[in-house]
């Protein structure tokens, strides 16, 4: 119970528990967070803009009103006056009551001290860099300091600190009555320098003197000067700080930066390399600004020193765990929503909860429902602890810092569920556009036309989008840069407006704020000094004098006074030039003639003189440049692999699925009634081409019963691009007369289905083939109710219909711990049933294990040279490191996905064959790699010094594509996969109706020896091509590549009484993007395997997963067929499943003969029949 009160970051990883009923507090608080996030997600851009405007106004207000006041009153702070020095002083008392030891007392005790104690002021004058050997100046001696005759001043021994050796400062210390301090300070603002040389300046002849730094006039606050002052103040802090404090602060800042690094690493794991981490920091900074504004408005004093000391520990303690937890939950639910939406779209079902919410809304709401209460609870616990600290009464800045931190956490809570959830919404929408663009570009790289690629990508968007889910930016990649440019310009505009409005704000209205600012405890007030570090030797001398006089003494140790060696005419003044009325009059008079615009320009120029304002503007411009650079490089993201199973395999579910797909079961087991699945609405047909957008309002075709127009009228309509108004017969007439090319019917008509119908009639009436094609237009080859839009320009030309092919599913098959149904398109009976039997046996042994051994598509061009010498030089260059680098660079520049792995060269006379091997993402990649090869060869000829090279063919059969070749068997092509399963002996006997030894012997005799006798290349298997071809047809792969993809060797072993079977396929050529996979039926089959399209995080993973699935399916097919051969069931199974009658016995009288079959007797039967063997055979068997 106590652990629940700790914030999540201190509780570690919570154990996985079952879902519990939400508590009362969760039911009350979670809806509040969901309401805030719902508003932010509904209007993310508005939310980001409003928060950015408020944050910009807040920090500009803080800069003007608190930190960098330029009016007369604030100009006096930090100047050479006594009151400013006293603010950072410390008072010590020594006397008999303190046993003559120094004891710190409060300022209010000084007034009550009375006349029984001497009150002294101890001043320390610091002359920087005067001890350095390279310095041309030396510090003044104590008697050179101008001291009025009426003052009683005592010189004291100076005190060095640990940093004196680094800073090379000279120090003078003085003690004088406290009442005489202001007069001495006024007299010591300028100290002569005896070593200075008098020179001529524009103010006359003068020489450098030591000028009190606090009395110096800054005529121009340059950035360099600001940095120099900041460094000097930092060194002063180090001089007055304890060593332990320095170490603690250093560790605190290191830990804070490690927290930042941890934030970016965590966001990187969730797919955001930079921007989610930056937005998290922005959210926290905005919360800090809002908290600082509220804290200062309530009159709580906050100093810069306090912030610098406390912020690192606040960042380390609170961290960014809440943002990380929320981000992880949102991204995970977004992927879950996409997967479930895809499943519902395929089945026609719709989740009632998700039907009214788009993906972004659902992901955010589900994440807050899951993690919202934990986040709110952590915020509440942390705020309560800080409130206790603010009310504790502990001095030293703890109260003020806790007060500020509590308000910061409160605003961080508000911004987490508003600003940050809006950022997450925008991120999810950018990811959607990225998926759309990546899929389109991958299809274009694979040779698909832009129109078809855009339609396929758009279809994928629609699959994952519910009705009414409008895109935030649109579907164009250019929408993202436009949005970001507008956001950046808007943010810069707000800052410019805020800065420009500063000169127009009424100074008198700030008087109350000035009064409040003076009570701020000194946002710019000096830090209290450590008296013993500043003047320990001087205190010892004063204490010795007090003891000798036996008189109590009060000593006020003032802040060290720093000097600079400068010309008096430039740096010494009675007042600040910024506060000088003459200066202001001259400044405003210069712009007075320009009216309001002049005052605005003057205000801007004056504001830009402030080093911090100019620094913020430079940072804003740098961020703008960085953001614009990011517009064209949105990082990929990913939370979890969709191919990873979400739960362990349920044996009962697996058994029921196997029984449903088992051919031995004639009926289904009775159970609960399941309503029929409604059909998903198909895309409307006809579809319209992109260049015929006006076809959405197509004119109806002319009724067929009207008389045909004349040829002149038809040709006029054709020239006016009004072909769609013609009847089918008129279009046929024009086409048969050669006026409309057959390939252009779809584009001309703007109606794909009508174009296919007319083409059928044209082919049926073609005189050259009419004798055999006359029935085509009335044939049973279907052509209607098909989405021809995806076929046109991508898959097939001169379309006359589509060929329905039966598709069955084998399985389920457990592959690498996940169950799959294997889709197979085939007309061969028993094939699916046989594969299902193999799946059942493999599942009984724990499933199949697969290993991916290679991934690289190849293309082997042929180039020729005039002489063998040149051909050999080209081969040596290609094999060298320089040649490899140049060719890789050229090849990789042609695609975002194709990456050249290696090149293998072979020389045949003067012909040089180069085998390029590359990865191609999730596409099979033949077109992608061909484009890369062309460009690489061009670079080789032009830049590699082989301009005499002649390209014979981009494909020189050295690939080798769609042909049996030993090269593919040895070096591989596409994906290399090895699948293995171990089948218990009992399963072999009960399911496969055979035994382990018989299967092993059959495999050796048939698949190994038999294939070797036939001189096979890669054909050491029973029927791998059967399974590969069926899956290829079902999933939209290239059927011609079955030739090399079916290369397989099947190996079986007896492993401790169990059957160990494996298949090795070194040249499996598959893809999940492009080609036939863009067709909806084939895409649906990839959907049931979970590998459709490109992988969201790792391009190529889907294609590799499909290769593993095919390898495991081939394993099941090999196991089942070999078992049927070993048991003699092959012919009987074909006869049963093909519904063919068994052959009758011949009526010819003949002795009964053993039928010729493929059955094999078992080893035991063969050993039992040795009595019938000849003596020679028996003798050979004993050897």
From Swiss-Prot:
Catalytic residues, chain numbering: 828 (charge relay system), 962 (charge relay system), 1038 (charge relay system), 1134 (proton donor)
UniProt cross-references to Gene3D superfamilies, sorted A to Z: 3-hydroxy-3-methylglutaryl-coenzyme A Reductase, Chain A, domain 2 (3.90.770.10), HMGR, N-terminal domain (1.10.3270.10), Hydroxymethylglutaryl-CoA reductase, class I/II, NAD/NADP-binding domain (3.30.70.420)
List the ranges whose topology is Lumenal.
267-273, 321-378, 424-482
Sorted alphabetically, the Gene Ontology BP terms of this entry are: coenzyme A metabolic process; ergosterol biosynthetic process; isoprenoid biosynthetic process
Classification via SUPFAM superfamilies: NAD-binding domain of HMG-CoA reductase, Substrate-binding domain of HMG-CoA reductase
Domain of life of the source = Eukaryota
Record-listed E.C. numbers: 1.1.1.34
Binding site residues for NADP(+): 895-897, 922-930, 1138-1139
Record pathway = Metabolic intermediate biosynthesis; (R)-mevalonate biosynthesis; (R)-mevalonate from acetyl-CoA: step 3/3
Cytoplasmic topological domain ranges are 1-245, 295-299, 400-402, 504-1183
Q: What is this protein called?
A: 3-hydroxy-3-methylglutaryl-coenzyme A reductase
Organism, per UniProt? Gibberella fujikuroi (strain CBS 195.34 / IMI 58289 / NRRL A-6831) (Bakanae and foot rot disease fungus)
